[in-house]
Amino acid sequence: MQVRQSIHSDHAKQLDTAGLRREFLIEKIFAADDYTMTYSHIDRIIVGGILPVSKAVSIGNEVGKQLGVSYFLERRELGAINIGGPGLIVVDGQTYEIGNEEALYVGKGAKEVKFSSIDRANPAKFYYNSAPAHTTYPNKKITLAEASPQTLGDDATSNRRTINKYIVPDVLPTCQLSMGLTKLAPGSLWNTMPCHTHERRMEVYFYFDMDEETAVFHMMGQPQETRHLLVHNEQAVISPSWSIHSGVGTKRYTFIWGMVGENQVFGDMDHIAVSELR
């Protein structure tokens, strides 16, 4: 488990490229037949990936000591979105088949969660977020058709995109976790521009569906102290509440967003005009 500490905006604006990447970029999400896990002190979110190829993978009790619990989801909820081939998630004996761009929400208290691929030649890739939970809500599979879609932007501003909200109050109840997958329209390269912050939630962006030579310039920082990170395929960026989070790609890409914090009102954000950015 990697641990990322919280960082003040006054400190962050003084960092060089290496420092920004060390604090905010998660460079490796997937490892074959294993899981990755990054624990952020910001709202206590956990971010990672699970890539079962030749065997099933589960997050065992080895993380219990680090989390101060007996097992991973004793006091947590989890959301996983599959960006690979068809896979299976078994939660305390209940099996869910999760295809590409399908998701599973797992409520607090699940003791055993196993991830596997149906075809090792086309393995599943489960990207997951986990947040502290105060009560147990039912496990639920969410397909792309069941997600709550919202199309924003315009071709003229190169930011037309469809936000597919998988884990939001309109689809299912959770304690605080929200997740979704945003697809850009052909020819659009910008996401979330004009940008925003939200004081009451933090967010993580996970970029994928990119070829080797594609990069996303991810904008971050306070609106009057912007910085950027160069992000490549299957990498994630931690965004504190004080930071904008927006990106532009050299070519097409897709991204998954996950939020935790004080509320789950999707529109609760502080919009920033482009003319106000520095």
UniProtKB/Swiss-Prot annotation:
Homology family = Belongs to the KduI family.
Molecular functions per Gene Ontology: 4-deoxy-L-threo-5-hexosulose-uronate ketol-isomerase activity; zinc ion binding
User: What is the protein name stated in its UniProt record?
Assistant: 4-deoxy-L-threo-5-hexosulose-uronate ketol-isomerase
* Keywords attached to this entry: Isomerase, Metal-binding, Zinc
Q: Which cofactor does it need?
A: Zn(2+)
Residue ranges spanning the membrane: these are none
Q: Which GO terms describe its biological process?
A: D-galacturonate catabolic process; D-glucuronate catabolic process; pectin catabolic process
Leading EC class: isomerase
Q: Which classification does the entry list for the species? A: Bacteria, Pseudomonadati, Pseudomonadota, Gammaproteobacteria, Enterobacterales
The UniProt entry, under HAMAP family, shows: KduI
Cofactor binding note from Swiss-Prot or TrEMBL: Binds 1 zinc ion per subunit.
Source organism, top-level taxon: Bacteria
Alphabetical list of InterPro entries matching this protein: KduI, KduI/IolB_isomerase, KduI_N, RmlC-like_jellyroll, RmlC_Cupin_sf
What job does the chain carry out? Catalyzes the isomerization of 5-dehydro-4-deoxy-D-glucuronate to 3-deoxy-D-glycero-2,5-hexodiulosonate.
| Protein's UniProt keywords contain tRNA-binding | no
